[in-house]
Amino acid sequence: MVLCMKYDKLTQKKSVLDRCRPLHSDIVRNLDDWFRVELTYTSNAIEGNTLTRRETALVVEKGLTVGGKSLTEHLEATNHASALDWVKEKVAATQKNISEKDILKIHDVILKGIDDHNSGQYRNVSVRISGSAVVLPNHAKVSYLMEEFADWLATDNDIHPVEFAAEAHYRLVTIHPFTDGNGRTARLLMNMILLMSGYPPAIIRKRDRLKYITALETAQLGGSKEAYLKLIAKAVDRSLDIYIKAVKGEDAEQENGDTLLKIGELAKAVGEANSTIRHWTKEGLLEVSDITDSGYHLYATDTIERIKQIHVLKKKRLTLQEIKRHLT
């Protein structure tokens, strides 16, 4: 029910954006340029690339070399940007179903010059996800599973486009058909589906990396997909807001910033004790965006707004469980 409401909200926001089409060419160009850098930066950062957002922009937009960074990190940036360009060209040229060939093409561009032997090729070895209990399919089954996956992609379905895109991402990373580049390929596939459906791309923020990986793993180990599907829906929601605010002439690009607050900083900002923040986190009212090497919780800046909402609801004498249900 909660997810259905979220998808209804996305449909409504898309309708608002659709009523503004065609967008002015300057707005389209600015958004395309920003999303190109942001998607490249975040997708690579999730996989461990150390280029900052600014460095990624210099590499992708200016073709510059950043001192102290490896050739592979530079190639990961330029390759992802090129793969995204190909995806957008494909979307603009046709509305046909996505094929295995398309997925292999995305992967080929992602690993170009990094691992030419395996780029655009299904794996022929067994692989594991480092630090995860998820057991991936035997390499002998990959070709069959990908054929089955492509058939599923081509099948008419009645689920919401955002859920369909998220499910496609989930299924591809669970098959894990490549030796490397599975996550980046899956996120580009997801965004290809979103673009084909008239939605903006979903950006998985660097600060959401832990939630993203945990939600995926929970589902892959037989648990609920709800947290994962909510995360993707929220990412699309943010992108819709960015587009709508751009049309209105408002600056929304900073919404994907990576500033994280320590518990003391958050507590001071909202006038609460550290112990209260810890308690609300334990009760599920607040989400931890990341954890330091020392085990300290870090919170996104938008947690401040959530706590303000909690304050309002507490004044109405709602219990913590009632507040949690209200905010979900």
Give the label of every model feature segment.
Residues 1-180, 184-288, 292-297, 306, ...:
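FIC/Doc superfamily catalytic core
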Residues 300:
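Aromatic-rich, solvent-exposed beta-strand/loop patch
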